[in-house]
Amino acid sequence: MGLQEDFEQYAEKAKTLPESTSNENKLILYGLYKQATVGDVNTARPGIFAQRDRAKWDAWKAVEGKSKEEAMSDYITKVKQLLEEAAAAAS
């Protein structure tokens, strides 16, 4: 399987992560996903009253400059790590 297919597979697996997944980890995944699918941030930073959107924008901005392939690879690695942690916590 190619990187794109693996990425799509792990994007689906990410949806099965437990509710207990930290917001920090969710934001990391969000930023990597956006970088992999869109590229560098292409919108203005949301205002101070839009805290959730601002946090998501900041997570995306944090990975600015990564190639789409690098972002896909990092995303896959992070999802694998979180799935392993969830499995270990469940046993």
Swiss-Prot record:
Regions that span the bilayer: none
Superkingdom of source: Eukaryota
Single GO biological process annotation from the record: fatty acid metabolic process
Induction, per UniProt: Induced by cold stress. Down-regulated by wounding and infection with the rice blast fungus Magnaporthe oryzae.
Gene Ontology cellular component terms for the protein in this record: cytosol
Pfam families (UniProt xref): ACBP (PF00887)
Tissues with expression: Highly expressed in leaves. Expressed at low levels in roots and seeds.
One function term, GO molecular function aspect: fatty-acyl-CoA binding
Keyword Cytoplasm: yes
InterPro entries on file: Acyl-CoA-binding_prot_CS, Acyl-CoA-binding_protein, Acyl-CoA-binding_sf, FERM/acyl-CoA-bd_prot_sf
Annotated compartments: Cytoplasm, Cytosol
UniProt entry keywords in alphabetical sequence: Cytoplasm, Lipid-binding
The ACB domain, residue ranges: 3-88
Major localization listed first in the record, in broad terms: cytoplasm
Keyword Calcium (UniProt): no
Binding site for an acyl-CoA: K15, Y30, G31, L32, Y33, K34, K56, Y75
Similarity comment text for this entry: Belongs to the ACBP family.
Role according to the record: Binds medium- and long-chain acyl-CoA esters with high affinity. Can interact in vitro with palmitoyl-CoA, oleoyl-CoA, linoleoyl-CoA and linolenoyl-CoA. Binds phosphatidic acid (PA) and phosphatidylcholine (PC) in vitro. May play a role in the biosynthesis of phospholipids.
PANTHER family for the chain: ACYL-COA BINDING PROTEIN 1, ISOFORM A, ACYL-COA-BINDING PROTEIN, ACBP
Name assigned to this protein: Acyl-CoA-binding domain-containing protein 1
Organism: Oryza sativa subsp. japonica
Taxonomic placement: Eukaryota, Viridiplantae, Streptophyta, Embryophyta, Tracheophyta
